[in-house]
């Protein structure tokens, strides 16, 4: 029996001797499953942590936006009428004290000072006989605009040897329009009338009939319509200067005179002219613009740019 006991061996020794794996070892597939399970648990834990962070962020955001979304307390709304009421009471009590209080207690009621508008200025040039007298009354009779004027001054300027006369509209006491009348220093036969401001009254019936009758009679007193009209035009940089010739025959001169009168009455040099004078003025303007090299160049560049813009763009493939 001893021999049998000594020669016997356990099953574990037999399996080890045979080179078999132990019973508790795992296969590679089981290792991968274990790693996947651990990764899923870590992912779930991180998801819960992220949800908690987002919940805290939303809570802080709602806490910050709550004051701006909530209505103002009743005390603040009740305080605003009291401030306006106190300002009104101060103004009723003492105007001087109210002005000082408004500058300190009510700054919102202050308004920035606005710049005063500059008076509108327009110039009319009338060609007259150079042999006429240079006194203000003669010049005023030459430039007829349909208004009544009162002379209030005269002086000689440094750049012109001829005196400049100052007139004020006498049609209405409150009319702010002023007129300056002076002979041109370069051309003695040219009278320059400068108007400042706009009339705040309407034309009288006599003045309206005077201007209308002048335009009507000029169309019939000018003789043949084929004769050249005694009108020349010159345009300055601002486009507010027109020159009319009044030195030729009476009939054609009345047409130009009518243009000056209507120009001064309208205040914008836009007149009710006869068709012949209007056509002649258009021809003069076209001639002046054609002789202006800068204007022609500007029009040429604008037309060229317009033509280039209309050409369709064709891509070039090299």
UniProtKB/Swiss-Prot annotation:
Transcription repressor. Interacts specifically with the W box (5'-(T)TGAC[CT]-3'), a frequently occurring elicitor-responsive cis-acting element. Regulates, probably indirectly, the activation of defense-related genes during defense response. Negatively regulates basal innate immunity and XA21-mediated defense against X.oryzae pv. oryzae (Xoo). Transmembrane segments: none annotated. Belongs to the WRKY group II-a family. ATP binds at residues 259-266. Residues 29-49 form a coiled coil. Residues 1-27, 65-86, 100-136 are annotated as: Disordered. This is WRKY transcription factor WRKY62. GO terms for molecular function: ATP binding; DNA-binding transcription factor activity; sequence-specific DNA binding. Residues 138-204 bind DNA. GO terms for cellular component: nucleus. It holds the Pfam family WRKY. The WRKY domain is required to bind DNA. InterPro entries: WRKY_dom, WRKY_dom_sf, WRKY_plant. Residues 7-19, 76-86 have a biased composition (Low complexity). SMART domains: WRKY (SM00774). Its main location: nucleus. Keywords: ATP-binding, Coiled coil, DNA-binding, Nucleotide-binding, Nucleus, Plant defense, Transcription, Transcription regulation. GO terms for biological process: defense response; negative regulation of defense response to bacterium; response to bacterium; response to chitin; response to fungus; response to salicylic acid. PROSITE patterns: WRKY (PS50811). Induction: Might be activated by XA21 in the nucleus upon pathogen infection. Induced by biotic elicitors (e.g. fungal chitin oligosaccharide). Induced by pathogen infection (e.g. M.grisea and X.oryzae pv. oryzae (Xoo)). Accumulates after treatment with benzothiadiazole (BTH) and salicylic acid (SA). Transactivated by WRKY45. Interacts with XA21 in the nucleus. It is found in: Nucleus.
